[in-house]
């Protein structure tokens, strides 16, 4: 697999042109465009495993033809993943316990040098498998890997030591530490994530009052933004993400951030007094003066009720993984707010995917940060 690196500037320019056109009806200012590294930028990857007369190798499927193809090196993935791909298969080849009915391998790496390898099977994992996996892990450590090894099968998950890696990001000269659990969402392009965090901090610099974040995940944004605000209230529905967020809050010494496990839609109902939630016991929403809201919704964008709630805030920071639903949401948001800043973050080079951000301020807040 080779990358069209020489085409990257033109591909990025085309994305910027497309996003600029989508934002044009809303009087958006000039885009801040953040380019990615042109190779080895992706920190996670997953592959099917193909067994062929005693040999085995990683495969992927062509999106157009659906035909499988062999993958020995994967230049969009981190150097760490590429090195592990080669060493891992060499170490398990010929080991019946570790290779039999192995159908997929997932890799999660970090900028900090740690990597988690998840091996997925169409069989139950036995004590014998665990013993062989422990020996495999020791051999991988012998190669210099800081590795966690996880086995998964139907209704089974075995982490030899733990099921997470620890990331460290240098954001505006400060190190933020994040626990990232395998098979949970993490930002795939680590260096671009840093650029997104720094852009979000630049937008919210000198903010007054409190911040509300919907869809906070493992606290990626809310932790980095916490010292910009008096207090931060954040929501997330995934149990594993909430647990990671709580750990990340503690390890970063953040004392003004509260995470609530509920969906954005449920929180909207709570704010509007539609329902009373047991999960909100002990949390007095009236103690928060949230004049800024941060949203990073799924591809479908914000639902109508949440969109209306978001309009009630003076300042809106909206990170989008789908510029078309962003544009659709902006039709309503720009009735009350104006776009002060907008950005393109090239999380996924060589694809049509566009990650973007907009910073909106209520129309009567002229000249205010």
From Swiss-Prot:
S-adenosyl-L-methionine binds at residues 187, 215, 220, 236, 296. The keyword Lipoprotein does not apply. CDD domains: AdoMet_MTases. One of its GO terms (molecular function) is tRNA (uracil(54)-C5)-methyltransferase activity, S-adenosyl methionine-dependent. PROSITE patterns: SAM_MT_RNA_M5U (PS51687), TRMA_1 (PS01230), TRMA_2 (PS01231). It catalyses: uridine(54) in tRNA + S-adenosyl-L-methionine = 5-methyluridine(54) in tRNA + S-adenosyl-L-homocysteine + H(+); uridine(341) in tmRNA + S-adenosyl-L-methionine = 5-methyluridine(341) in tmRNA + S-adenosyl-L-homocysteine + H(+). Signal peptide: none annotated. Pfam families: tRNA_U5-meth_tr (PF05958). The keyword tRNA processing applies. It is an enzyme of class 2 (transferase). The active site is at residues 321, 355. GO terms for biological process: tRNA methylation. GO terms for cellular component: cytosol. Keywords: Methyltransferase, S-adenosyl-L-methionine, Transferase, tRNA processing. Its EC number is 2.1.1.-, 2.1.1.35. SUPFAM superfamilies: S-adenosyl-L-methionine-dependent methyltransferases. InterPro entries: MeTrfase_TrmA_AS, MeTrfase_TrmA_CS, SAM-dependent_MTases_sf, TrmA_MeTrfase, U5_MeTrfase_fam. Belongs to the class I-like SAM-binding methyltransferase superfamily. RNA M5U methyltransferase family. TrmA subfamily. NCBIfam families: trmA_only. Dual-specificity methyltransferase that catalyzes the formation of 5-methyluridine at position 54 (m5U54) in all tRNAs, and that of position 341 (m5U341) in tmRNA (transfer-mRNA). This is tRNA/tmRNA (uracil-C(5))-methyltransferase. It comes from Glaesserella parasuis serovar 5 (strain SH0165). The gene is trmA.
């Amino acid at each position: 697999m080779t990358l069209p690196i020489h085409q990257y500037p033109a591909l990025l320019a085309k994305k910027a042109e497309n996003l600029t056109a989508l934002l044009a009806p809303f009087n958006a200012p000039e885009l801040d465009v953040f380019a990615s590294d042109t190779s080895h930028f992706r920190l996670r990857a997953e592959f099917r495993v193909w067994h062929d007369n005693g040999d085995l190798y990683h495969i992927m499927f062509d999106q157009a033809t659906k035909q499988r193809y062999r993958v020995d090196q994967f230049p969009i993935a981190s150097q760490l993943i590429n090195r592990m791909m080669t060493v891992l298969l060499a170490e398990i080849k010929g080991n019946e316990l570790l290779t039999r009915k192995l159908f997929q391998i997932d890799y999660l790496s970090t900028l900090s040098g740690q990597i988690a390898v998840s091996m997925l099977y169409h069989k139950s994992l036995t004590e014998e498998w665990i013993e062989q996996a422990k020996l495999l892990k020791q051999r991988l450590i012998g190669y210099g890997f800081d590795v966690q090894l996880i086995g998964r099968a139907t209704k089974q998950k075995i982490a030899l030591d733990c099921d997470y890696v620890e990331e460290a990001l240098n954001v505006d000269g400060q190190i933020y530490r994040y626990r990232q659990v395998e098979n949970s969402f993490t930002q795939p392009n680590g260096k671009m994530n840093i650029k997104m965090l720094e852009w979000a901090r630049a937008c919210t610099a000198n903010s007054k009052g409190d911040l509300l974040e919907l869809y906070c995940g493992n606290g990626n944004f809310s932790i980095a933004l916490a010292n910009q605000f008096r207090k931060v209230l954040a929501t997330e529905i995934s149990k594993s993400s909430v647990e990671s967020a709580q750990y990340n809050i503690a390890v970063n010494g953040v004392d003004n951030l509260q995470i609530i496990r509920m969906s954005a839609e449920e929180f909207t109902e709570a704010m509007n007094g539609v329902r009373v939630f047991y999960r909100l016991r002990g949390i007095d929403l009236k103690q928060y003066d949230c004049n800024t809201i941060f949203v990073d919704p799924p591809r479908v964008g914000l639902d109508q009720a949440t969109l209306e709630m978001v309009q009630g805030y003076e300042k809106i920071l909206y990170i989008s993984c789908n510029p078309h639903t962003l544009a659709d949401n902006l039709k309503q948001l720009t009735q009350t707010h104006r776009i002060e800043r907008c950005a393109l973050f090239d999380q996924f080079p060589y694809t049509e995917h566009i990650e973007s951000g907009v910073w909106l301020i209520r129309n009567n807040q002229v000249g205010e940060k």
